């Protein structure tokens, strides 16, 4: 292992001991915010520190076995040979483990997420497919015991959604779903198609992380244009008689957010502001990532969120993820919410990219 990596690990070991000491300090214990922050840091350091301690012991065992190979006694050398092979395997395994643990983590992975699904090309069929995607994500959320809350919905005339925005609350929601951002294409025969021709439709999916109030970008009220209107259901039927729905336009960026799911204008405004904060933060995050990764391949399109990432082919029962050239004939399982068969390989590929970048550095 590189000397620079060893030094970094030794620094983390020292920091772990420092945090542990602080957690037993009465002054820190009385400051709940600081105590909570240090507890989180300690839990984040725990795995890498534990592995590094095991690595240090394995290194000692390996060095000792190597010395024993120089012994004059034949029996001792034979014993050392076995120990040498075994300790070398353990050392290599722990080295690989530490490299993965040292990969930079997205601080937003543990946050809640906003999921936005919009019908694209394909008219009514695209809206119906947006409904199918919503159902797929709903099943996945149920399996993970995450809560879903509809923020805004614009129903399709013949089923599905022209647009639906939901908040997903649960541990690791954003970290799991963030790779879903992009264009999703469906190939199938619509129910209204009398001649059995396969049609192609598309939807775009955007996944944003929730921005905690304490970390939210400051939004100047003077930069906002707020409109109220009556919330409406499918086909334009009014569901209440008051102007409870909210449309907020952030003038500098041109970002527009609507929220009409709650009966209270106050609640709709609060939800719209949280979505607006997430979208503005996403724009800022994108700028930062683009600056940092101008020469690095990204699994999710860096600028164009509509770039096609996946195709769902119903006649063949096939789903293909174009970012990693993965094709599975398990469409029914995926549409029932078994998304891990797609998400796990993408995460592994992303991890491999980061390891390669680490090696280059």
From Swiss-Prot:
PROSITE patterns (UniProt xref): RF_PROK_I
GO cellular component terms given for this protein: cytoplasm
Superkingdom in the source lineage: Bacteria
Entry-linked Pfam families: PCRF, RF-1
Signal peptide: none
UniProt keyword annotations, A-Z: Cytoplasm, Methylation, Protein biosynthesis
Residue numbers spanned by region Disordered: 285-305
Segments of skewed composition (Basic and acidic residues): 285-296
Post-translational modification: Methylated by PrmC. Methylation increases the termination efficiency of RF1.
Subcellular location field: Cytoplasm
Residue numbers bearing the N5-methylglutamine modification: 237
Primary location recorded for the protein, binned into one broad class: cytoplasm
Molecular function GO terms recorded: translation release factor activity, codon specific
InterPro entries: PCRF (IPR005139), Pep_chain_release_fac_I (IPR000352), Pep_chain_release_fac_I_sf (IPR045853), Prokaryotic/Mito_RF (IPR050057), RF-1 (IPR004373)
NCBIfam families: prfA, PRK00591.1
HAMAP family for this protein: Rel_fac_1
Protein role: Peptide chain release factor 1 directs the termination of translation in response to the peptide chain termination codons UAG and UAA.
Listed name of the protein: Peptide chain release factor 1
